[in-house]
């Protein structure tokens, strides 16, 4: 799509020049953006464009100029001598890179007809506006960051953001279109600040960590990492495991000590917590007493602190903590609230200004060092991803020889019957949602399978057994399983026994760390 927009000059030139990094100069030799001075690699916060300007080529003076000077007329493309170095623009580099990515090439990779790609590109660019929602599925593929980068580049070219009817990204119940507020905090002594992990858990499994004990909140061992067999080996080598969870999950089975936690509906106090979300301030009001031996997160935290002789620094009650984080907010609207005032509104108090829908980026100011929409990531130059460059998934692609042995891509998808692995054990839901793997009927026929058959799903990592179901909406070459399926509800084994745990090297440079590629997994299926 980007290639069509560039080739047919369908881009929004005003938006590109004035609100993106596409006219910024790049040193051809290093691939780095031209700045006023070298950045400090140890700086905790990147310098702003005001502190360390980016540069463009000013066509009026035929010289480099700071990007944010009002009188500058930046060149969109070209190659220039800048202080003895050959420099070009991000836009020029993008055009060069996109030459190989024709609609015909995209058809060969994706199966989407080239004519459809051209039509979609033209409709997206010519608008007048487009709201592009979704993107949630490919976050389980090894190359997911490239897809997100490419989407941002399309937006930068067309200006499909910051105007009525336009936007891009994952629509998650008000995260981006909702209003926000800021709670205060309970002050703690300096020696009670959070420590720093030696390394993330997915790296600790490789055997290089010093960690001997783990405290897990929720089903971290099964839900957060692929390849459960490797995770199990790591867990066996630990001296001590504690799991805090309302549910008896796969991770809980590995625990030496289980601290049963309450759900959001149970509390030993009238008010347990307070959150801001979905344009409202919401109290966690008590619905029922804690069941059985379950305890609240607040109680568990206090008891752990007591063992270290630090409980005196924590609030005496959860109501006291809630009152404090409200009153200490730097937002006057929030700090004026009390528990009684919020409960007078049935525990859900609207944030200020929610009568007007929140429209993001209407001022075309972005949360980047330059305050522009940044599509050139020079921190990823060494990985060849300063601009989005296609690379196949880690495992699930046609060019992988492994596909000759394991020809099906296993996709982990959401279901309306559960929230991840929560409610797995709800008996009345189980009658509608027996764990099954779904295949296209053509794949069923190849394997001599019928709906309801018990099958084994396997690869060189491991296997599990469940029942199979035909589904014409599943593409040939694919298999679908609702995520969060655990061993207690399968015939045998665990879905995570087969899932991919690899990740790309550049993952450490990404804002949220590497992608865990659960759906970037190849399997074969046979009758059990």
Roles of regions detected by a PLM:
Residues 265-290, 299-300, 305-307:
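Glycine/threonine-rich phosphate-binding loop and adjacent beta-strand/alpha-helix elements that clamp
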Residues 70-81, 90-93, 108, 151-254, ...:
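Extended redox/cofactor-interaction regions of prokaryotic respiratory oxidoreductases
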Residues 2-127:
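Long, well-ordered, tryptophan-enriched scaffold segments
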Residues 10-15, 117, 131-132, 160-170, ...:
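Acidic/polar loop patches that form or flank catalytic/metal-binding clefts of enzymes
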Residues 230, 236-240, 245-249, 285-305, ...:
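Phosphate/diphosphate-binding loops
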Residues 141, 287, 297-342, 423, ...:
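Long, contiguous, secondary-structure-rich segments that constitute the structural scaffold
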Residues 105-113, 135-142, 174-175, 219-222:
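Conserved short loop/turn motifs at secondary-structure junctions
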Residues 18-23, 123-124, 167-178, 317-330, ...:
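A glycine-rich phosphate-binding loop feature that marks nucleotide/adenosyl-phosphate handling sites
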């Amino acid at each position: 799509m980007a290639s069509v927009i560039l080739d047919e000059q369908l881009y929004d030139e005003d938006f590109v020049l004035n609100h993106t990094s596409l006219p910024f100069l790049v040193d051809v030799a290093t691939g780095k953006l031209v700045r006023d001075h070298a950045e400090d690699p140890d700086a905790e916060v990147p310098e702003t464009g005001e502190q360390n300007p980016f540069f463009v080529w000013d066509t009026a003076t035929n010289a480099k100029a700071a990007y944010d000077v009002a009188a500058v007329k930046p060149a969109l493309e070209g190659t220039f001598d800048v202080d003895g170095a050959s420099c070009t623009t991000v836009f020029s580099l993008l055009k060069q890179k996109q030459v190989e990515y024709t609609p015909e090439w995209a058809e060969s990779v994706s199966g989407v007809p080239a004519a459809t790609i051209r039509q979609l590109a033209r409709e997206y660019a010519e608008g007048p506006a487009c709201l592009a929602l979704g993107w949630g599925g490919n976050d389980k593929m090894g190359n997911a960051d490239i897809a997100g980068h490419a989407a941002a580049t399309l937006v930068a070219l067309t200006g499909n953001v910051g105007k009525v009817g336009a936007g891009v990204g994952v629509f998650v119940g008000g995260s981006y279109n909702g209003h926000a507020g800021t709670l205060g905090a309970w002050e703690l002594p300096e020696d009670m600040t959070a420590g720093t992990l030696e390394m993330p858990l997915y790296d600790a499994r490789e055997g290089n960590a010093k960690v001997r004990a783990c405290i897990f909140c929720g089903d971290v061992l099964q839900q957060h990492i692929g390849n459960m067999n490797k995770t199990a080996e790591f867990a066996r080598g630990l001296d001590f495991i504690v799991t805090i969870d309302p549910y008896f999950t796969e991770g809980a089975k590995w625990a030496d000590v289980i601290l049963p936690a309450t759900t959001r509906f149970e509390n030993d106090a009238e008010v347990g917590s307070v959150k801001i979300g979905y344009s409202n301030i919401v109290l966690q009001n008590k619905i029922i007493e804690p069941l059985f031996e379950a305890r609240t997160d607040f109680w568990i935290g206090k008891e752990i602190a007591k063992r270290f002789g630090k409980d005196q620094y924590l609030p005496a009650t959860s109501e006291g903590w809630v009152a404090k984080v409200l009153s200490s907010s730097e937002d006057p609207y929030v700090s004026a609230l009390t528990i009684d005032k919020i409960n007078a509104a049935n525990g859900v108090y609207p944030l200020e200004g929610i009568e007007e829908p929140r429209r993001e980026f209407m001022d075309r100011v972005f949360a980047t060092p330059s305050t522009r929409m940044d599509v050139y990531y020079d921190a990823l130059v060494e990985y060849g991803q300063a601009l989005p460059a296609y690379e196949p998934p880690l495992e699930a692609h046609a060019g992988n020889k492994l596909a000759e042995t394991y020809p099906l891509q296993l996709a982990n998808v959401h279901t309306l019957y559960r929230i991840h692995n929560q409610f797995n054990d709800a008996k009345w839901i189980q009658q509608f949602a027996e764990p099954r793997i779904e295949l296209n009927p053509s794949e069923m026929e190849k394997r001599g399978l019928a709906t309801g058959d018990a099958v084994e799903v396997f690869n060189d990592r491991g296997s599990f057994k469940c029942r199979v179901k035909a589904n014409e909406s599943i593409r040939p070459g694919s298999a679908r399983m609702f995520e969060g399926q655990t061993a207690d509800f399968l015939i045998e084994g665990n879905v995570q026994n087969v899932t991919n745990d690899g990740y790309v090297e550049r993952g450490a440079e990404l804002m949220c760390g590497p992608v865990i590629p659960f759906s970037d997994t190849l399997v074969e299926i046979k009758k059990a």
